Curated annotation (Swiss-Prot):
This is dITP/XTP pyrophosphatase. GO terms for biological process: nucleotide metabolic process; purine nucleoside triphosphate catabolic process. The lineage of its organism: Bacteria, Pseudomonadati, Pseudomonadota, Gammaproteobacteria, Enterobacterales. Homodimer. Pyrophosphatase that catalyzes the hydrolysis of nucleoside triphosphates to their monophosphate derivatives, with a high preference for the non-canonical purine nucleotides XTP (xanthosine triphosphate), dITP (deoxyinosine triphosphate) and ITP. Seems to function as a house-cleaning enzyme that removes non-canonical purine nucleotides from the nucleotide pool, thus preventing their incorporation into DNA/RNA and avoiding chromosomal lesions.
């Protein structure tokens, strides 16, 4: 199996991607398991930040790297929290604090104006100086609920209602979520690109 460093310390992302990529002969190792610190996310877009993270992990480890930068864009907030989704509630942000801040921010927004979209950009670098990284983007439309529901997933999943499924992302099974989520879409594109190239 080809060892690949996953440029994240987010346990939820590691679990989700490692299980999906193991079928393709890729042994995913979290950067934290290899003593790699987090790259500074100075980009203004998901793509820029994913490339920064992948390049940093590949440079430190000498391994191919996959990085994910993802977040939630809420229409009524002009796309916020966007690239700041993981630290929306401040420096000591947690999933719960971020979720509560978003619900509070949207409390006066009518139900018919609570559309949102999860975005995920996956970047694969063959090596740290790779001039042609594979860049794959997935997006997943939904609606922000007024109350959390479900115990699965992570992040904003309990308040992200998926109209096509009639439930929140946190109420979906891992398999259901992987089949339709932003990360599942980006991963499918990445696997197709790896297969073909």
């Amino acid at each position: 199996m080809q060892k690949v460093v996953l440029a994240t310390g987010n346990a939820g992302k590691v679990r989700e991607l490692a299980s999906l990529l193991s079928d393709f002969g890729l042994d995913i190792v979290a950067q934290t398991d290899l003593g790699v610190d987090s790259a500074e996310e100075t980009g203004l877009t998901f793509i820029e930040n994913a490339i920064l993270k992948a390049r940093h992990a590949a440079k430190v480890t000498g391994l191919p790297a996959i990085a994910d930068d993802s977040g939630l864009a809420v229409d009524a907030l002009g796309g916020a929290p966007g690239i700041y989704s993981a630290r929306y509630s401040g420096e000591d942000a947690t999933d719960q604090k971020n979720l509560q801040k978003l619900l509070e921010t949207l409390k006066d927004v009518p139900d018919d104006q609570r559309q949102a979209r999860f975005h995920c950009v996956l970047v694969y670098l063959r090596h740290a100086e790779d001039p042609t990284p594979l860049v794959c983007h997935g997006s997943w439309p939904g609606v922000i609920t007024r109350e959390p529901a479900g115990t699965g997933g992570f992040g904003y999943d309990p308040i992200f209602f998926v109209p096509s499924e009639g439930k929140t992302a946190a109420e979906l099974t891992r398999e259901e979520k992987s089949a339709i989520s932003h990360r599942g879409q980006a991963l499918k594109l990445l696997l197709d690109a790896l297969r073909n190239g």
